[in-house]
Amino acid sequence: MIIHVFTSESVSEGHPDKIADQISDAILDAILAKDPLARVACETFVKTGMVLVGGEITTSAWVDVETITREVIKDIGYNSSDMGFDWASCSVLSAIGKQSLDIAQGVDNRETKILGAGDQGLMFGYASRETDVCMPAPIAYSHRLMARQAELRKNNKLPWLRPDGKCQLTLKYDQGKPVAIDTIVFSTQHAPEISHKDLVEAVREEIIKPVLPEEWLSAATRYYINPTGRFVIGGPLGDCGLTGRKIIVDTYGGMARHGGGCFSGKDPSKVDRSGAYAARHVAKNLVAAGIAEKCEIQVSYAIGVAEPTSISVDTFGTGHLRNNVIIDLIKTHFDLTPQGIIDHHDLFSPIYRQTAAYGHYGRDGLPWERLDKVAALAKAL
């Protein structure tokens, strides 16, 4: 038996950075719903009593930035300054300009079809057979724990829960397969009247146990639930939040590499977003087709150039075909130009706010999660 451990974390939809991500993507969705060819790079900053929305947006549409911002904060559940934020009373400031003409000339042609990538950059996609959604287990189950926290908060089963929170899972692996949970760290914002003892019991029984596989839990599993003892001050009252600061939470929890570019607030002409989604689609279909047990894809782009400047693959010794053969399969079955990616996944649709909490991968209903190339790829085996 060869045991190693790996840790990933997730954060709640009420975490300050995730508030910012959701506002940025809600504004993006509102613009794309009216103007699918808009160019959007929307950044959000949140702090006590204040939201600042900035960036570069070129569009024929008008959207009410203030109303959208307040609706997002309300949906998350910040309705009182006592818990760190109040959707009704916070100030909303806007500092939005237009996309640089120097960038636009490399991205668009006269028919407003995308010619080239919106920037240079490198992106990674990853998939493995660890879970039913082809995601690493630590990040997949961390997201599920945080989603469970929000569910019990919003349905009032645990009415003392508040929006901010985060969790961290350390899993034990035996020869590359998850076999047990070593450590659970779970911190949730709460109302002041709940005792620490009652909180710990409720989190363990109502959030953790229903989500995590029973066979992975044992007497050896370590639990750290609100280990400081108190988490009443949270949200933007406790920390400022900024779009794009949770890129590892958004992707693979550190199990795969990351190119550095964030997703939220960016329209699909930005390959930081669309290129990463396409790389995930490639990796997931390769794994599902049986070509590898796990697979990491890297693509890179040059600004104004349509074709990727490079495609590479790593199957970590689990591949059933040589890497050069896999790359040829990718080039044959996947159009990785920005326009090809956008067309295949219908990325001009307003689908992005849902991705801004609980991860961009391993979820139903997202076009880059489809297994639509498996049959064609499997023929190569």
From Swiss-Prot:
UniProt keyword Transmembrane helix, yes or no: no
Reactions mediated catalytically: L-methionine + ATP + H2O = S-adenosyl-L-methionine + phosphate + diphosphate
Pathway, per record: Amino-acid biosynthesis; S-adenosyl-L-methionine biosynthesis; S-adenosyl-L-methionine from L-methionine: step 1/1
Family of the protein in this entry: Belongs to the AdoMet synthase family.
GO cellular component terms, A-Z: cytoplasm
Binding site for K(+): E43
Subcellular location: Cytoplasm
GO biological process, one term: one-carbon metabolic process
Keywords noted in UniProt: ATP-binding, Cytoplasm, Magnesium, Metal-binding, Nucleotide-binding, One-carbon metabolism, Potassium, Transferase
UniProt cofactor note: Binds 2 divalent ions per subunit. Binds 1 potassium ion per subunit.
Record's protein name: S-adenosylmethionine synthase
Quaternary context: Homotetramer; dimer of dimers.
MF GO annotations: ATP binding; magnesium ion binding; methionine adenosyltransferase activity
Entry EC no(s): 2.5.1.6
InterPro entries: ADOMET_SYNTHASE_CS, S-AdoMet_synt_C, S-AdoMet_synt_central, S-AdoMet_synt_N, S-AdoMet_synthetase, S-AdoMet_synthetase_sfam
Cofactor(s) for this UniProt protein: Mg(2+); K(+)
EC class: transferase
Binding-site positions, ATP: H15, D164, G165, K166, R230, F231, D239, R245, K246, K266
Pfam families named in the record: S-AdoMet_synt_C (PF02773), S-AdoMet_synt_M (PF02772), S-AdoMet_synt_N (PF00438)
